[in-house]
């Protein structure tokens, strides 16, 4: 989640959560663009024809500056419901993402809301979750593998790929659990920094090519890039284990604390558009779980 986490402690920030949307970019600075042309700062969404979204310009499958990510599609759906035009403020999703965007020391902040934050993330006011996903095993179909648990003894014999998250190379929750089981020497780390296009895809490419036998990956990343492979891949949710680190997360939208009006409007839109949102998620290969806290 570049933190690949866009949930590590924040989806992508630090610690074992999933990715804030999904990754942590090495990009710095920001640029603001509308649906077609650049524009200056907009006022609050409630009174503006613009709908300001802070997002990462190079963080597929979540978002990019071409509007191809599932968060781009969902943001466009919400903006349409508001009768507004989506306007993006691009900022690399890394440490300080919320501080430098929504909570920037500007009168209105840089944007009105962000996508893809963990439910109840304390730097913002979160909406009800609009989806729930999980870390998954990814391995080729038809090669005799049937991994359903981190306790499967075959994991000690396979080459396992994992994402290393964030600037300090934090590991996602399943990797902590592998370590507890003594599965260490056969684990290969893949970084998520953007020195090349779509770096999170490298781990899925490696599974398809046979460079590694199985990968443990955040579901939205795994599902999206697995769909692009010629080799059919199996995605199996990693079941929870006893401990402090969950593998599945509820994902919400975040608005600036105190903006009750926008929070209420977003909640109403989510209620109206949940079926369409789920179609977008499924179209992008996101593995969806039953909600834990309020997805309808």
Regions found by a protein language model. Name each.
Residues 5-16:
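Bacterial N-terminal signal peptides
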Residues 15-36:
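Signal peptide processing junction and immediate N-terminal pro/mature segment
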Residues 22, 38-43, 85, 166-184, ...:
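Ligand-binding clefts/hinges and TM-proximal coupling segments of bilobed small-molecule sensing domains
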Residues 56-59, 132-136, 144, 227-270, ...:
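Periplasmic-binding protein-like
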Residues 84-85, 103-116, 158-159, 202-203, ...:
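Alpha-to-beta junction loops
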């Amino acid at each position: 989640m570049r933190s690949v986490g866009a949930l590590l402690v924040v989806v992508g920030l630090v610690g074992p959560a999933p990715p804030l949307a999904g990754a942590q970019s090495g990009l710095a600075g920001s640029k603001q663009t509308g649906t077609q042309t650049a524009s200056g700062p907009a006022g609050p969404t409630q009174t503006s024809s613009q709908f300001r979204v802070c997002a990462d310009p190079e963080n597929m499958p979540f978002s990019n500056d071409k509007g191809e990510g599932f968060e781009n599609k969902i943001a466009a759906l919400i903006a349409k419901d508001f009768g507004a035009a989506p306007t993006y403020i691009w900022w690399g999703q890394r440490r300080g993402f919320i501080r430098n965007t929504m909570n920037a020391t500007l009168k209105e902040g840089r944007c009105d809301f962000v996508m893809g934050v963990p439910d109840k993330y304390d730097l913002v006011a979160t909406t009800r979750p609009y989806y729930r996903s999980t870390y998954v095993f990814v391995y080729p179909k038809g090669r005799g593998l049937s991994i359903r648990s981190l306790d499967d003894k075959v994991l000690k014999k396979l080459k396992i790929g994992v994402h290393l998250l964030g600037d300090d190379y934090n590991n996602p929750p399943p990797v902590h659990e592998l370590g507890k089981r003594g599965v260490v020497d056969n684990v290969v780390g893949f970084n998520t920094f953007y020195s090349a296009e779509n770096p999170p895809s490298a781990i899925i490419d490696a599974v398809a090519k046979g460079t590694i036998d199985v990968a443990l990956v955040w579901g939205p990343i795994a599902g999206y890039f697995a769909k692009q492979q010629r080799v059919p891949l199996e995605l199996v949710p990693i079941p929870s284990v006893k401990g402090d680190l969950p593998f599945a997360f509820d994902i919400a939208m975040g608005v600036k604390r105190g903006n009750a009006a926008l929070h209420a409007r977003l909640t109403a839109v989510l209620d109206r558009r949940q079926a369409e949102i789920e179609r977008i998620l499924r179209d992008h290969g996101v593995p969806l779980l039953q909600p834990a806290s309020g997805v309808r």
